């Protein structure tokens, strides 16, 4: 059980920046950014490639910068060329497939066997004992969460939040929604790149298809966290992303080790959970309408 808990905590914190990214793009900006899958692989590819040549620490900010560039492309397509947000993400995600192959030296996968990573360097320094991977994951993700919450309280962060709530009002206030959207998508994809970078070094490998379904998993984590903590404030929203990621990874680890549900079915279950959670308000309205309809028929019969 200790192994399950440790693995779940490690993966939960490592993948949490994806949930934070979706909190920013989906909840704050109200944009369905589908760049996430390709951006995650981009972060991992850049990180693994730089780590393989002896730069594991430089690999982290480089992966974030690459992710931010991907977000900027999506924002440019959306704000300057008038491409709908979903299509803009799909177009960027499609192009990233080739970019990711290029970052990996035109190979479908790349390994770090025999190379030092930020995790192995921490272990060799004797820091954290057997929990060194979890320690680093907590520090990196915790710092990202604190910086995000701090940013959302700044003038630019408030402008970004206002853009998601009412872009017309923002435009009337002499603010440029295109700029705030670009900043938001750059930050969101930088965090996705951070997650990819950390996971790539943690697993010591990257595969061209390793990002498949990441956006759905990130949404599931966010929705699970919001169900537990709610989202009545920015702080709760950020914490919900972290807590949801931990809960999801714990469930995943339990299922993986106990074989309660075939592992192959987990992504299907995740997709169903996300679909039901997003459709919950409509389902509730439909149920309320049916109750009112039944009550009206009952009164009419009397």
Residue spans of the language-model regions?
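Alpha-helical transmembrane segments within multi-pass membrane transporters and channels
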Residues: 22, 55-94, 99, 141-142, ...
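Transmembrane alpha-helical segments in multi-pass inner-membrane proteins
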Residues: 192, 196-267
């Amino acid at each position: 059980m200790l192994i399950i808990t440790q693995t779940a905590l490690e993966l939960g914190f490592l993948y949490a920046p994806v949930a934070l990214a979706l909190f920013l793009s989906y909840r704050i900006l109200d944009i369905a950014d589908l760049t996430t899958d390709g951006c995650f692989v981009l972060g991992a590819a850049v990180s693994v490639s730089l780590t393989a040549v002896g730069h594991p620490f430089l690999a982290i900010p480089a992966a974030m910068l690459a992710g931010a560039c991907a977000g900027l492309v999506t924002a440019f397509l959306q704000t300057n060329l008038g491409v709908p947000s979903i299509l803009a993400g799909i177009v960027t995600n499609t192009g990233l497939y080739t970019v990711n192959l290029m970052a990996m030296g035109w190979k479908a996968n790349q390994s770090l066997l025999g190379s030092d990573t930020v995790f192995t360097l921490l272990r060799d320094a004797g820091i954290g004992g057997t929990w060194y991977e979890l320690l680093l994951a907590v520090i990196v993700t915790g710092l990202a969460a604190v910086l995000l919450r701090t940013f959302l309280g700044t003038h630019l962060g408030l402008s970004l939040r206002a853009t998601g709530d009412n872009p017309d009002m923002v435009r009337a206030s002499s603010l440029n929604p295109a700029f705030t959207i670009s900043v938001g998508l750059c930050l969101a994809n930088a965090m996705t790149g951070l997650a990819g970078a950390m996971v790539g070094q943690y697993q010591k490998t990257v595969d061209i298809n390793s990002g498949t379904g990441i956006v759905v998993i990130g949404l599931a984590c966010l929705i699970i966290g919001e169900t537990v903590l709610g989202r009545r404030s920015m702080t709760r929203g950020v914490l919900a992303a972290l807590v949801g990621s931990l809960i999801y990874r714990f469930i995943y680890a339990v299922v993986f080790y106990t074989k309660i549900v075939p592992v192959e079915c987990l992504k299907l279950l995740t997709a169903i959970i996300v679909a039901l959670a997003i459709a919950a308000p409509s389902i509730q309205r439909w149920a309320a309408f049916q109750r009112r309809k039944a009550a009206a028929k009952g009164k009419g019969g009397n």
